[in-house]
Amino acid sequence: MRDELLDETKIAFITCVNSDDWYSECRLYLESLLIPEGMTAEFIPIKDAPSMCAGYNEGQEKSNARYKVYLHQDTLVVNKNLVQDLRNIFAEDTIGAVGVIGCRSLPRSGVWWDGLRTYGRVLHACEPESVVDSHCREPEGAYQEVEAVDGLFIATQHDIRWREDIFTGWHLYDTSMCKEMQRAGYKVVVPNQEQDFWCIHCPKEKPLAYEYKGYQKAFIREYGRELNPEV
């Protein structure tokens, strides 16, 4: 949706859902967030999506909210002041997207966690008895510009289509969106979380799916010439 049609008083939380139990937990945390006076929040679960990009595009089309948060069903947002924190960062119109963890410069592989300088913080709760504070570098100021962020949480203030024409599954959609933001002239940033983290992520421990490599090759074909890795 064009910027002039977006409603600055609304924030939408968009999630692809295949587990009602997980989404109920995710939604519980979202409904506990502090919503600034004059703003409203809407929650858009997308079920039976053929891919993450297709689901997120469907959610994007359903909302005219200026601020949209695309998050996994197993992401729990614990920062009560999230909405105001996002508004503060998005006061700079050139910022297109905010993630909670990512890398300053993508390596040739296109895999963000292989980058030399990773920024941000996420609490990973993969098992009931195992909680890991994944704490990378912290921005020196309120945020750090990065090239890519992880898809567990991506907030936007400009509507850019997710590349469902290329990423027809569940991998590399997030890094692709970051590159699409940059192609449109917008920055992608990670906030300072030194005092406290924004999200808990509860993924199941599992190896990378076999189709990951195929999407990695597709990513490199589309964006490889735009990568300038740090050495």
Where are the regions a protein language model picked out?
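The conserved acidic donor/metal-binding loop of glycosyltransferases
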Residues: 72-76
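C-terminal catalytic/acceptor-binding lobe
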Residues: 165-231
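Glycine-rich, basic loop-to-helix element that forms the pyrophosphate-binding segment
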Residues: 49-63
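Conserved donor NDP-sugar-binding/catalytic core segment of glycosyltransferases
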Residues: 80-119
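A conserved hydrophobic helix/loop-capping motif in glycosyltransferases and polysaccharide synthases
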Residues: 10-22
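Short aromatic/hydrophobic "clamp" motif used to bind/position activated sugar donors
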Residues: 68
